[in-house]
Amino acid sequence: MAGMKEIRGKIKSVQNTRKITKAMEMVAASKMRRAQERMRAARPYADKVRAIAAHMSRANPEYRHPFMVANEGAKTAGIILVTTDKGLCGGLNTNVLRATVQKFKELEEKGQKVEATAIGSKGLGFLNRFGAKVLSQVVHLGDTPHLDKLIGAVKTQLDLYSEGKLSAVYIAYTRFVNTMKQEAVIEQLLPLSSEHFEADDGTPATSWDYIYEPDAQAVVDELLVRYVEALVYQAVAENMASEQSARMVAMKAASDNAKTVISELQLVYNKSRQAAITKELSEIVGGAAAV
């Protein structure tokens, strides 16, 4: 009977765990939908800023913003690492951290030092353990990221690049593909290549639906900073959508596994109970025969 009592305890424990993982799955599904909405809402802003900057850059080819000029003499590169603040999201962080380590090695093989900015507690902890130099950090963004909270940490990297101290700035994050698939990517943020401005809205460079003051240079300076900030925000938004999707899938898998374990334990319990009943019946029959 002690064995049956122990099995009942295990079944109860797994059932309680399944209730928790099921609740977390439902919460993650709700947060995932909101995160996807924020991710999609951020795209039109970045696209419009890019289109305007593209028009003005072509209209003023003699001016080159520092973000568009390669700092070939710099011996240090910057990486903005975007991870989550919480765990229980499968291999999401592991994949982007593995890609970041590979990028560190590639840059170091080229004679480049690496200085990092951490967005997310998991990435910050990893960089500290890895021994990387952390220039700036921002953690505990919550479920709704605000650009105001990101700007300070990101601006450190942008300022160093503008001063010619960084050869390039990369951003590592998890791109949202769909609910079941997310992929770790590392993209070059600076210098801005011509590819950033190739796909515009089809309006000729000499046609404008806006005016600017005091001059094109001042506007381009502001627009390019806003554009890079928008790219960072988009990466964070995609990472958050990926986080909630991965967490929902992980919790669903945990709930399904718990259900399987409960079924197996229930089978063991039934067999033990059947064996105990059979033994009691045998003892009763044996006693009656003796009488």
Curated annotation (Swiss-Prot):
One biological-process term from Gene Ontology?
Answer: proton motive force-driven plasma membrane ATP synthesis
Bilayer disposition of the protein: Peripheral membrane protein
Q: Which InterPro entries match?
A: ATP_synth_F1_ATPase_gsu, ATP_synth_F1_gsu, ATP_synth_F1_gsu_CS
Q: Where in the cell is it found?
A: Cell inner membrane
Protein keywords? ATP synthesis, Cell inner membrane, Cell membrane, CF(1), Hydrogen ion transport, Ion transport, Membrane, Transport
Instruction: Report any Pfam family annotated for this entry.
Output: ATP-synt
Q: Which CDD domains match?
A: F1-ATPase_gamma (cd12151)
What's in the GO CC field? plasma membrane; proton-transporting ATP synthase complex
Extract the GO molecular function terms from the UniProt entry: ATP binding; proton-transporting ATP synthase activity, rotational mechanism
As for family, the record states: Belongs to the ATPase gamma chain family.
Identify the NCBIfam families for this entry. Answer: ATPsyn_F1gamma (TIGR01146), PRK05621.1-1 (NF004144)
Tell me the subunit arrangement: F-type ATPases have 2 components, CF(1) - the catalytic core - and CF(0) - the membrane proton channel. CF(1) has five subunits: alpha(3), beta(3), gamma(1), delta(1), epsilon(1). CF(0) has three main subunits: a, b and c.
Role played: Produces ATP from ADP in the presence of a proton gradient across the membrane. The gamma chain is believed to be important in regulating ATPase activity and the flow of protons through the CF(0) complex.
Q: Which PANTHER family match?
A: ATP SYNTHASE GAMMA CHAIN, ATP SYNTHASE SUBUNIT GAMMA, MITOCHONDRIAL
Q: Which HAMAP family match?
A: ATP_synth_gamma_bact
Q: Can you say what this protein is called?
A: ATP synthase gamma chain
Name the lineage: Bacteria, Pseudomonadati, Pseudomonadota, Betaproteobacteria, Burkholderiales
